[in-house]
Amino acid sequence: MANTTSAKKATRKIARRTAVNKARRSRVRTFVRQVEEAIASGDQAAAAAALKAAQPELMRAATKGVVHANTASRKVSRLAQRVKALSA
């Protein structure tokens, strides 16, 4: 348990940041899931639209430090590859 005033404040700040990060991570997962569902349904137009919405969300999460930049880039790349394969 935190004893000093500064440690107590740090604990409160961590709790707030954790809540924000959890919400951002959940939002990213939702967008990625929408892309994967569109890919699974075979709808190329819907998959492309979902990817277009998911990409900035993933990169924003990377900018904010919620996910690593390389992780976000890898996810975008792999999703784009799968969407492109639908049109082939």
From Swiss-Prot:
Transmembrane segments: none
Presence of the UniProt keyword Transcription in the record: no
Single GO MF descriptor: small ribosomal subunit rRNA binding
Any one Gene Ontology BP term: translation
Keyword rRNA-binding attached: yes
GO annotations of cellular component type: cytosol; small ribosomal subunit
Coiled coil: none
Region spans: Disordered: 1-21
Annotated InterPro entries: Ribosomal_bS20 (IPR002583), Ribosomal_bS20_sf (IPR036510)
Gene3D superfamilies with a match to the protein in the record: Ribosomal protein S20
Assigned keywords, A-Z: Ribonucleoprotein, Ribosomal protein, RNA-binding, rRNA-binding
Protein purpose: Binds directly to 16S ribosomal RNA.
Sequence similarity: Belongs to the bacterial ribosomal protein bS20 family.
Name this protein carries in UniProt: Small ribosomal subunit protein bS20
Species this protein is from: Sinorhizobium fredii (strain NBRC 101917 / NGR234)
